[in-house]
Amino acid sequence: MITENLLVGNINDSKDPPVKIGALLLVAAEFSLEAPGWVISNRIPFSEYAEAEPLLLDHAVSWVEQHCSSNRVLVCCRAGMGRSVSVVMAYLCCVQGMAYADVFKLVMTRRPGATPLPKLEDAITQVCLLREARAKNKKDLDSGPPAGA
């Protein structure tokens, strides 16, 4: 358990999640999703040991954000130590506004031996920028054209 609503797990956890879980995200490219029907689930494939692609990471963060407010979310990969941890770290930085150093410390305390993906901090920075641009565009669209236009 990383936070009260965010957990990380391995491939076996994705097949038989605890009943306290309401949503499950599988982030392992080499596995198919075999989650039970009672849990909301999705698969966003990341390659093991590769750098996180910012667009994929953004998609995963948005999915976790969408489901985390009303569910405990379990993010799984093969071992539950790399890709799943990286997605949770990105969520905590980009959505919860935590500093990367604080998130890293939290994750290492809660999940000793975790190995975030290479250059994760850079990818998280890109995701935060994508999210900011999206929010600005939405705000601009919602406010309509300027007066006199």
Role assignments for model-derived ranges:
Residues 1-72, 93-126, 132:
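Cysteine-based protein phosphatase catalytic domain of the PTP/DSP
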Residues 15, 86-88, 148:
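Residues at secondary-structure transition points
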Residues 71-89:
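A phosphate-binding catalytic loop at a beta-strand-loop-alpha-helix junction
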Residues 131-138:
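A charged, well-structured terminal subsegment
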Residues 140-148:
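Positively charged N-terminal leader segments that act as targeting/secretion signals
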